[in-house]
């Protein structure tokens, strides 16, 4: 590291490198001379963008490009329970079906999901697992599409993208024929409370009538699980750029989804961001925060 144009005197330096613990250093600069220093940095458990990583609460992340890390799972019951315990945030109402800690949390609004991200950012910065220039948040609508392998037009609303969605699923173009590709309203859900018999996928059995443990089905090529089914996932955007009433966006379908058009990768569910439901959950991303312009 070469630093030029320093004024003579004692200089305090803070060395920061992804994947290593920060190090404080003092050097003395003398007019007309070169000051040299040798420093050994200690490896940390902090994030290195571009590499698979596990954070401080055992959430696993996979890279998407150079500046974004994606949680490979939907946020779990255990993750959210820790958030409630440490922050005092109001706990979601219990699901009307049994869930274990490794199931996706449900009955959370977009506002709840944002609060979780803010808490996790503060927690991980304090533990020096992420830098002050990193933050957890919900994925944008466009980022979610990229996560699921779908390239869509930038600069337009999720509502426009929804109206012009392609007839493709995260696993391909064919409707599942016996192969377990996700947790939907299947034969195991036929007739259970909350699912009508005529609102299931005939001939398909994923083995889970309600939510499934995260990661129960095969991941996509990025190593991400459950991008179709299990729970619908909140994203950051509003459904329309203009409108009197704000509508949030949910992606991916859920355990009660049975209609083909609602399982297309480009399908969106537009609901008020304060709504909570037993099919609503979320996953988080870790992003580099752009520097503020002067």
For each feature predicted by the language model, list its residue ranges.
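Short, solvent-exposed S/T- and G/P-enriched segments that are highly enriched in secreted/extracellular
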Residues: 1-7, 25-26
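Residues marking the start of alpha-helices
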Residues: 2, 71, 101-104, 135, ...
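A short glycine-rich, aromatic-capped structural motif
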Residues: 7-8, 12, 17-18, 36, ...
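Extracellular and select intracellular beta-sandwich modules with Ser/Thr-enriched
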Residues: 22-24, 35
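Short beta-strand edge segments in extracellular beta-sheet folds
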Residues: 27-32, 40-42
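Short proline/glycine-enriched turn/loop segments at secondary-structure junctions
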Residues: 28, 269-276
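Functional-site microenvironments in short loops/helix caps that host divalent-cation chemistry
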Residues: 99, 110-268, 278
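Short, structured beta-strand segments at or near domain termini in extracellular proteins/domains
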Residues: 278-292
């Amino acid at each position: 590291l070469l630093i030029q144009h320093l004024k003579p005197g004692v200089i305090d330096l803070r060395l920061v490198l992804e994947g290593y613990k920060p190090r404080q250093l003092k050097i003395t600069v003398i007019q007309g001379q070169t000051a040299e220093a040798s420093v050994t940095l200690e490896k940390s458990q902090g994030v290195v963008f571009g590499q698979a990583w596990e954070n401080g609460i055992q959430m696993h992340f996979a890279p998407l490009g150079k500046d974004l890390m994606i949680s490979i799972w939907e946020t779990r019951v255990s993750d959210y329970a820790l958030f409630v315990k440490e922050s005092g945030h109001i706990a979601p109402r219990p699901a009307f079906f049994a869930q274990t800690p490794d199931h996706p949390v449900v009955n959370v609004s977009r506002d709840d999901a944002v609060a979780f991200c803010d808490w996790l950012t503060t927690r991980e910065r304090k533990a020096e697992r992420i830098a002050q220039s990193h933050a957890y948040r919900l994925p944008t609508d466009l980022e979610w599409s990229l996560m699921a392998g779908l390239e869509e037009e930038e600069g337009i609303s999720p509502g426009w993208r929804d109206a012009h969605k392609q007839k493709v699923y995260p696993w391909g173009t064919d409707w599942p024929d016996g192969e377990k590709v996700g947790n939907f309203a299947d034969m195991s859900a036929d007739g259970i409370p909350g699912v009508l018999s005529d609102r299931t996928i005939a001939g398909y059995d994923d083995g889970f009538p309600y939510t499934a443990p995260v990661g129960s089905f095969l991941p996509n090529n990025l190593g991400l699980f459950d991008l179709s089914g299990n729970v619908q996932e909140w994203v950051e955007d509003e459904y329309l750029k203009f409108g009197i009433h704000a509508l949030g966006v949910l992606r991916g379908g859920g355990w009660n989804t049975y209609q083909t058009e609602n399982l297309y990768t480009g399908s969106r569910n537009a609901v008020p961001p304060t709504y909570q439901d037993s099919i609503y959950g979320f996953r988080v991303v870790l992003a580099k925060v752009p520097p503020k312009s002067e």
